[in-house]
Amino acid sequence: SADRITPFLDHLPADERAALAHVGAMLGRWAVFVDPPLHTRLRALMNKAFTSSALAALRPRIAAIVEDLLDAYVESDNPDFIAGFAYPLPATVIAGMVGVPDSDLDLFKSWSDDLATFVGSAQATPDKRERAERSAAEMTDYFGSIIAERRRHPVADQTIIDHMIAAREGDDALSEAELVANAVLLLFAGHETTTNLFGNGLLALLRHPDQLAILAADPTLATGAVEEILRYDGPIGTITRVGLEDVVLHGRTIKAGERVFSMIHAANRDPRRFEDPHRFDITRKDNRHIVFGYGIHFCLGAPLARMEGEIGLPALIDKLRDIELLDADPPWHDSLVLRGVKSLPIAFRASRPTLA
């Protein structure tokens, strides 16, 4: 089962469960944490808002955001690539898609960090629970207001929120609580994974300068480079499921109610699937990794993450020359789920702009 929220809450004493009312209600409605038939229903309605044509229309905007952020990063005194580019790019893109103004990005960064430490932590300490509950309550109020305003005053320049409000499957539509919860999911998942794609990706390229040189010489290899980054050091470490009944797998008994951690990072280095799996090679062929999951829970935002990587990666390599790591061993997030560096300070020489 994908539902690991209900078992977690059910094991808590009543007072502790009540103290997580908002975060429990929100996560319990996330499409990634529910099973069919509810998942089938949510996914069908959300798919109507995440069409290929809607994503394709975002390409010029993403390219413009990339250029603006790189220009600002070059002029900044902060060498941290995560703070200067890897975080604000996907955050700005997804915020615009769900109708959140850029002025609120710092607020959402704080909320998202609180959720990430709760969802991905090996141990949800009282402090992590308290911060996650507070942020879930604030996000519920925030998106509830946005959705109410969109219902009252529809706009011509529609966001994913507008499409989710309008989505219908027969007479069925997303409820208010489902709209709020999955708007938060889109914002959360829509930037966390792509931030790690860029952070882990640049780190891998800098540790393999031959591959960086190949990509710099031929930017058309960006698509393959993104796929190899996703395989070699992708943004997701594990995918968790809960046993519904006792089952024996490879001689090991998994009991009903036990959590099973699928190590996606390890699977993408499986020598039975990939030749020389620990080698980073942006020209690798047949690179069918599973970083975005598999089956009915395959990541809804995978095409968007790939598009951002394919646009942003060659642009930053063109803009930032002679890149060097200022910290050979950067810190990583403490998470069982997400895999990414917290910060990545670099030195570089900015390329001169092309004169028209």
Regions found by a protein language model. Give the residues of each.
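Cytochrome P450
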Residues: 1-356
